[in-house]
Amino acid sequence: MNSPIDPALVMPDVQSSADTRHIPIQRVGIRGVRHPMLVAGADGAPQPTVANWTLTVALPAEEKGTHMSRFVALLEKYRSVPMTPALFAAMARDMLPLLHAERGDITAAFPYFINKSAPVSGVQSLLDYEVQWIARAAGDQVEFELVVQVPVTSLCPCSKAISEYGAHNQRSHVTVSVVLNGDLAMDRIIRLVEDEGSCELWGLLKRPDEKFVTERAYDNPKFVEDLVRDVAARLAAHPGVARYRVEAENFESIHNHSAYAVVEG
């Protein structure tokens, strides 16, 4: 025969108690969680990385607290699964019943690497890109947003036009945010942005490659305005893009400030 449980040994579940202030919370959860992640690359092979995670849900006015430990349990469930945008959206959908919530968001920010061949020598090296995946779940509906920062070279058209010996150029960051309603791979977006810079970047270049990069940028000058417009035009023409935001920052080599532009569509 089982002995009765001593009430003194039963731990109270304070967070499940009712709240009397009647104020709903739009987002509550965990933030700044560093956790391993497998990202399915363009070739389908999983790329291990470490992401900075934010997971939140909406909390009704009558509930005192959410179940914080369940967010980490969800991360553990998906830790060894190669992530695609579709699976990331499914993860956000799974979070809602787990947390007894009607709405919730998941954000994962991580470095992503592409192996690139230098333009002349063909020597291979990795280049890193800063990426965010964002899933916003409401009931059975999930909106997926991809944010990727692509470094490129920009060369000033005005400087080229007025100078006899060259033109000032610099590294630029083009940050693209897209809400997808169809298929558009992350690698294709990165390639699209790199095509619209004065020249793309590589991790490792030999002297013949440096010559190519210098001359390629000189033959393809672009203002920061050109950068955002050209990338926006490419995105607007793609049927898989529902909304987009293109942001470019040129770290000017002849000024102590940046040139900056944004296009939204």
Swiss-Prot record:
List, alphabetically, the InterPro entries matched.
Answer: GTP_cyclohydrolase_FolE2 (IPR022838), GTP_cyclohydrolase_FolE2/MptA (IPR003801)
Record's keyword terms, sorted? Hydrolase
The site feature described as May be catalytically important is recorded at C156
One GO term (biological process): tetrahydrofolate biosynthetic process
**GO MF terms held by the record:** GTP cyclohydrolase I activity
Q: Pfam families in the record, alphabetically?
A: GCHY-1 (PF02649)
Q: Does the keyword Hydrolase apply?
A: yes
Q: Does the keyword Hydrolase apply?
A: yes
Reactions it catalyzes:
GTP + H2O = 7,8-dihydroneopterin 3'-triphosphate + formate + H(+)
Assigned EC number: 3.5.4.16
Pathway(s) it belongs to: Cofactor biosynthesis; 7,8-dihydroneopterin triphosphate biosynthesis; 7,8-dihydroneopterin triphosphate from GTP: step 1/1
Reading the lineage from the top rank, the first entry is Bacteria
Enzyme class, first EC level, given as a word:
hydrolase
Q: Report the family membership.
A: Belongs to the GTP cyclohydrolase IV family.
Write down the PANTHER family for this protein, in alphabetical order. GTP CYCLOHYDROLASE MPTA (PTHR36445:SF1)
The protein's role, per its UniProt record: Converts GTP to 7,8-dihydroneopterin triphosphate.
Instruction: Supply the HAMAP family for this chain.
Output: GTP_cyclohydrol_B
Listed name of the protein: GTP cyclohydrolase FolE2
